[in-house]
Structure formats: structure tokens, C-alpha cells
Amino acid sequence: MSDDEQERTIAEDLVVTKYKMGGDIANQALRLVVEAAKPGVSVVSLCEKGDAYIMAETGKVFKKEKEMKKGIAFPTSVSVNNCVCHFSPLKSDPDYTLKDGDLVKIDLGVHVDGFIANVAHSFIVGVCKENPITGRKADVIKSAHLCAEAALRLVKPGNQNTQVTEAWNKIAQSFKCSPIEGMLSHQLKQHVIDGEKTIIQNPSDQQRKDHEKAEFEVHEVYAVDVLISTGEGKARDGGLRTTIYKRDPSKQYGLKMKTSRTFFSEVERRFDAMPFTLRTLESVE
């Protein structure tokens, strides 16, 4: 966005419509993936299912607007048990097959003209009325749910981001759980998934000192990420390679190799500044 271009917000009816369209598609994609997440189903197949649905459905809206960008704002990720988030493996990576009792976290995002709708859901495979969740898995899911409910009430004009952080800590502690240290929820803007204003979870002393306090304002949009653990809340490297990347529009670098330039132009054309998975580029030469 250029300096003389006015930022578009939900003060515009058309912007609200685009958010709603993205939200409807995101919720339908999430429902589709959750329903397909049965014992014996592979994580890769679920990720592919979610992404394919998003691309198909976003292709049906604003068809006359040929230049409008729309599609995946965050690749479908299926993170199981102690994997915190954003697990979206390549076809060539070791896959994981779901089984009864797995705690599954699904997250994905959709955008229409750069206006982003992110959704997520956590559940236990094989759970039903006759086979309810109990114990620590029940504690952590209930804690996360109440934290999300608290955020819905606290993220409003005039409140501070620190109020949300404090509420999450209190709720998690009441279930003997911990928010994952240092995880951020970001303000969303057109074509920007990681806006300047953030809400931090369970900050360390240094993070608390460094994190910028902010007040929520009218017409702002936020993606609220709630990540709760039955452990101490400190994420560790699981040894898996990164598969989700994002182009940084603020960085400029002259690529020397032809293959690098081809790859970069494909990323720019298809994803702009949205996160993408290498899985969708496995055929790029």
C-alpha cells in the first residue's frame, strides 16, 4: 500500500462483505477437515483437502474482478498432540496417521482481496457423547475455550492488550495449565497477516519488558490465537523442518540464479505477502 493510499477498514460495507465471504469459506473448510479427521486418515491428506476447498471456493467469488487476489491466507495445518501449531508436511515428508485419542489442532486462513479470515479448532479423535473427554485433555481444551471466550469480550475499543494476556494467564492457571510462552495474536490489515499491534501469551520477563502495550481501537481486526499446554508452556524444537514461509515485502534482494528468480516470481504471483506451504510449489521448476 502506497503512502497516499488510504487504509481500507471495516468502516466500508464492501470490506465487511469480503471479510464475511472469507469467514464463511474458512468455516466451511474447517468443518470439512474436522469431519474428515478420523482414525487412519493421514495429516497430509487433511491439509490438501482444506487447501483444495479454499482454492475452489474463493475462485467462485468476485469472478469479474480479474485482478483481485484471493485464496489461501494461511495453509491448512494439522498439529497433533504435543505439536504446538502450523504442521503442514510435504508429500515427501514422513506423514502422521491419526488414531483414537489424538488431540488435533486444525488452523487455516482465507482471504478475499487481502482481507483475512483465520480459524482454528481443537478436538480429540474418536470422542462422542458415549465416549467423552476426561482428565488433562479435557482440562486443556476447556481452558483454551474459556480463553477464547474471554478474548471475544476483552478485545474491544478502549481496552489494552495486556488485559487479555492477564486474563489468559488466570484462566489457564485455574486448570493447572499454561499458555504457550511468547506466542502472539496479530492485528490484521489488508494483505497483512502480522500487523503491528499484538497480544502476547505468557511472556517471559524479557518479553514482557520488550512487548509493546497497545489499546484496541474502532474498526481494527485481530486474529486471536489461543495456545494452551498441560506442561510448563515452553515450546521446543521438534526437529521437523519448516514448510510454511511468507514473503517479506519490506526486504529487497537481487536474486542471481534463474531458478531462484522463477521461484520468487511464482511466490509473488500466487501468494503475494500471504504465508504459503512448499507443498503447493513442489511442481515448480
Which role does the model predict for each range below?
Residues 1-285:
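Active-site neighborhoods and metal-handling regions in enzymes and metal-associated proteins
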